[in-house]
């Protein structure tokens, strides 16, 4: 798979990233290198490899799940640039 400059522009637009025209070639090369690496990973035979969730065998302590509000919503929302009704307010980015 190969990425062209039109695809770089589209990905940048979807990610809401401003990209100058003189950066397109470099980003195209970077994305193509990443995709080439991913394609190499897809070619590996991992049929005999056991799935794992951690590279170090660790057992995590279990605890009962309890729903709380964190007991400090004011402190949490104090860091928000904008809040309404106890929630973070963010700009709409999905069209």
Swiss-Prot record:
SUPFAM superfamilies: Glu-tRNAGln amidotransferase C subunit (SSF141000). InterPro entries: Asp/Glu-ADT_sf_sub_c (IPR036113), GatC (IPR003837). One of its GO terms (biological process) is regulation of translational fidelity. Its EC number is 6.3.5.-. Keywords: ATP-binding, Ligase, Nucleotide-binding, Protein biosynthesis. It catalyses: L-glutamyl-tRNA(Gln) + L-glutamine + ATP + H2O = L-glutaminyl-tRNA(Gln) + L-glutamate + ADP + phosphate + H(+); L-aspartyl-tRNA(Asn) + L-glutamine + ATP + H2O = L-asparaginyl-tRNA(Asn) + L-glutamate + ADP + phosphate + 2 H(+). One of its GO terms (molecular function) is ATP binding. Belongs to the GatC family. Heterotrimer of A, B and C subunits. Allows the formation of correctly charged Asn-tRNA(Asn) or Gln-tRNA(Gln) through the transamidation of misacylated Asp-tRNA(Asn) or Glu-tRNA(Gln) in organisms which lack either or both of asparaginyl-tRNA or glutaminyl-tRNA synthetases. The reaction takes place in the presence of glutamine and ATP through an activated phospho-Asp-tRNA(Asn) or phospho-Glu-tRNA(Gln). This is Aspartyl/glutamyl-tRNA(Asn/Gln) amidotransferase subunit C. The lineage of its organism: Bacteria, Pseudomonadati, Pseudomonadota, Alphaproteobacteria, Hyphomicrobiales.
């Amino acid at each position: 798979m190969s990425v062209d400059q039109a695809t770089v522009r589209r990905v940048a637009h979807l990610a809401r990233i401003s990209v100058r025209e003189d950066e397109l070639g470099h980003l195209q090369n970077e994305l193509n290198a990443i995709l080439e690496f991913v394609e190499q990973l897809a070619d590996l035979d991992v049929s005999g490899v056991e799935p794992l969730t951690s590279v170090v065998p660790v057992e995590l302590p279990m605890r009962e799940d309890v729903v709380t509000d964190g007991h400090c919503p004011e402190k949490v929302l104090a860091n928000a640039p904008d809040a309404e009704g106890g929630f973070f307010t963010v700009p709409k980015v999905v069209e």
